[in-house]
């Protein structure tokens, strides 16, 4: 397995009160899989992603990537945030290379290959201020892929983009996934996006965050949002998502 996750509990203590964010999370993600995570606000999706990334180690449980325990950030995990977080004083190719020497022929070759993959050929010397939001996010994706991570973690990477750019970048991401065969885990609030991208989909419930439903998406790529099969799966996901909201209301009301 590429990623195995076993979290008994992740909790915060605030003003003497314990707030359990995640509880009894068990996931096994195969190499090359594209898992999408969806759930209501406050269900711990982003917290789970940070735990897998090694950015949060204060929990009861374990995370392994190809048999190695995750205790801190490392080159085996790539992380993409909603904001691109590019360095404004660096060009596109310099941002992708980050702390590696762009004058090294091997580094330059990898950077050039990634620029081609994320469809930014011709913009190598541009600065972030000269890029659109979608272009900036493509630079961030290329930067995360430079060290060839075993798992790419994406925390709502297209959430701040307009609908047209968002759909375009979804196709770019799928193209990268097919070419690089990198295991991907993407957090989203968008049901359409979760069905369009993932070959496996996990729905979380909140308070505390738990896996409500794990669903394989048996649709061939490339996917067409207008087909009856796509719409049927989307409706199933929506129905399960609505159940998590009903559960939250019932538990909060003591029903």
Curated annotation (Swiss-Prot):
Q: Write down the superkingdom of origin.
A: Bacteria
One GO molecular-function entry: ATP binding
Keywords, in A-Z order: ATP-binding, Cell membrane, Membrane, Nucleotide-binding, Translocase, Transport
Q: Name one GO cellular component term.
A: plasma membrane
| Compartments it resides in | Cell membrane
Q: Which reaction does it catalyse?
A: ATP + H2O + aliphatic sulfonate-[sulfonate-binding protein]Side 1 = ADP + phosphate + aliphatic sulfonateSide 2 + [sulfonate-binding protein]Side 1
Q: Which SUPFAM superfamilies has this protein been placed in?
A: P-loop containing nucleoside triphosphate hydrolases
Mode of membrane association: Peripheral membrane protein
Q: Does the keyword ATP-binding apply?
A: yes
Give residues annotated as binding ATP.
Answer: 39-46
Q: Where is the ABC transporter domain?
A: 7-231
One Pfam assignment: ABC_tran
The EC designation for this entry is 7.6.2.14
Q: What induces it?
A: Repressed by sulfate and cysteine.
Q: Which family does it belong to?
A: Belongs to the ABC transporter superfamily. Aliphatic sulfonates importer (TC 3.A.1.17.2) family.
Assembly and oligomerization: The complex is composed of two ATP-binding proteins (SsuB), two transmembrane proteins (SsuC) and a solute-binding protein (SsuA).
Q: What does this protein do?
A: Part of the ABC transporter complex SsuABC involved in aliphatic sulfonates import. Responsible for energy coupling to the transport system. Is also involved in taurine transport.
Q: What is the name of this protein?
A: Aliphatic sulfonates import ATP-binding protein SsuB
Organism the protein comes from: Bacillus subtilis (strain 168)
For this protein's source organism, the top of the classification is: Bacteria, Bacillati, Bacillota, Bacilli, Bacillales
């Amino acid at each position: 397995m590429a990623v195995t996750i076993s979290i008994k509990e992740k909790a915060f203590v605030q003003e003497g009160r314990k707030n359990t964010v995640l509880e009894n999370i068990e996931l096994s993600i195969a190499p090359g899989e594209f898992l999408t995570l969806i759930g209501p606000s406050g269900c711990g999706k982003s917290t789970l992603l940070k735990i897998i990334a090694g950015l949060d180690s204060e929990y009861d449980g374990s995370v392994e990537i190809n048999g190695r325990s995750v205790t801190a950030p490392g080159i085996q995990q790539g992380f993409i945030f909603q904001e691109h977080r590019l360095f404004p004083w660096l060009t596109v190719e310099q941002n992708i290379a980050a702390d590696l020497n762009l004058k090294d022929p091997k580094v330059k070759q990898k950077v050039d290959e990634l620029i081609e993959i994320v469809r930014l050929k011709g913009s190598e010397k541009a600065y972030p201020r000269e890029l659109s939001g979608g272009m900036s996010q493509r630079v961030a994706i290329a930067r995360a892929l430079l060290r060839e991570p075993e798992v790419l973690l994406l925390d709502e990477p297209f959430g701040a983009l307009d609908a047209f750019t968002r759909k375009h970048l979804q196709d770019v991401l799928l193209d990268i996934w097919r070419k690089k065969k990198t295991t991907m885990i993407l957090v989203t609030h968008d049901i359409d996006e979760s069905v369009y991208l993932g070959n496996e989909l996990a729905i979380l419930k909140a308070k505390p965050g738990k896996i409500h439903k794990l669903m394989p998406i048996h649709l061939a790529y490339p996917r067409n949002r207008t087909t009856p099969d796509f719409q049927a799966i989307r409706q199933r996901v929506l129905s399960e998502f609505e159940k998590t909201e009903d559960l939250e209301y019932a538990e909060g009301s003591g029903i």
